Amino acid sequence: MFSIVVPVYNVEKYLHKCVKSILSQCYENFEVILVDDGSTDRSPEICDEFALSDSRCRVIHQPNKGLSGARNSGLNEANGIYILFIDSDDEIAPNLLNCLEINFNKYNVDIIGFNAVVNDIKGQCILSTGKNVGMVEDGIKIVQKRIPVSTVPLYCYKNEFLRKTNIIFKDGIYYEDVLFTAQIFMTNPKVFFLDETFYYYNKREESITTSKIKMKNYCDIVSICSELLDYEVVNDFAFENAYRNIIMSYIMLSEEIYRGMSMEDRKKGKINRRILMNNVKQRKSRVGILNYFVAEFPSLFYTVREIRRKIR
């Protein structure tokens, strides 16, 4: 059985489409855990309506704890063998669960990843996550190869595996799934990537990803980078290489966010930027010489990376 956790907060415009895409699965053995995170619109009533009309749906009503708190609440209540986290303004393809079960049985892995498309507010596709490779990989090797580690909704996890890691979503921050996914992959799970698109991100004007980047976004990604810098590094070449790649990718992410800020916020953020770069440089032996120079010249390395992307 699958447990599908859907954090819900003030999404009355989008919730019907999201849940209906789940209930329309051709595979029927699943539960939907709708976590109403203190919504102030009609979302709580909509959740209750789904629970009354379909026995596969159940609702958790809780005071607002943020996205991490909602996901953690759903995770605690999940009874399924497999767990998915679906954002309440997005949709999934009708054959997702069926395909996941077939491949979990075939490959006996801990995690299965899949592709997504991003639709704008008019429903037009503006981005695809690209092609995943249909093969089994170790989590450490995936990070070693610099294969992009996607956000939480693009993976299905074995419940037993997640319980053993004791990793949960960190409360009170943006980009909490960035930290969660990095921590999960550093436990070296067996991962299979499906080269198919099953997830549909729907951008909306008021969402975090489309609103003006604010100071808190940047401070949170700096906090995540700092937490990863304190991660215990095992004396193993593959692990060290993967760890350094993760540090590199999140330094670059912090630089990308920094560049998206207003000039006024950049001035405020310079202190945090300097603290992060100093933390990296102080851990030169752990993070490697390349990350040391990235911390010394973040703008230069970011520009080079963007040029290389365009050439490709």
Enumerate the language-model features and the residues they cover.
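Cell-envelope/extracellular polymer assembly enzymes that use nucleotide-activated donors
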Residues: 1-3, 21, 31, 179
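Catalytic core of nucleotide-sugar-dependent glycosyltransferases
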Residues: 198-204, 211-237, 253-280
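Glycine-rich, basic loop-to-helix element that forms the pyrophosphate-binding segment
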Residues: 62-78
